[in-house]
Amino acid sequence: KDKLSVNLFFDNTLAHKIEAGSDLFLIPSKYEPCGLSQLYSFKYGTVPVAHKTGGLADTITDYTPSTIANNKATGFLFSHYSPDDLLKAILLSLSVYEDKQAWKKIVTAGMKSDFSWKRPAKEYVRLYKKVSGG
């Protein structure tokens, strides 16, 4: 708590250690075609707070009363790319963090997320069979 480190270099091992040891991971990307950080976060039990864009919007299920009730929320998204909206998302995430039951639901849903090739592969097979008449 109350600690900050600034490193002006990239070290992949250190990056994974930091992400795995964090409760929240901020991803304020203006554009993000896909991104892997949120996927790593899910597996580490780290909750992403991200701009709702590209692959981040496709892979993070935003916290809402409905998504938390259905055990689907995996993080916090902000729609407008602005410091104010980022701050609102951070403050909301910190507020939810205080509710340990809700937080555990978000962490668990993220850790259970499946972004393997199994589902898309089955869908491709189904599609190929459909178009080939088989």
Question: What do these predicted ranges mean?
Answer:
Residues N7-F10, K105-V107, E123-Y124:
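Short coil/turn segments at secondary-structure boundaries
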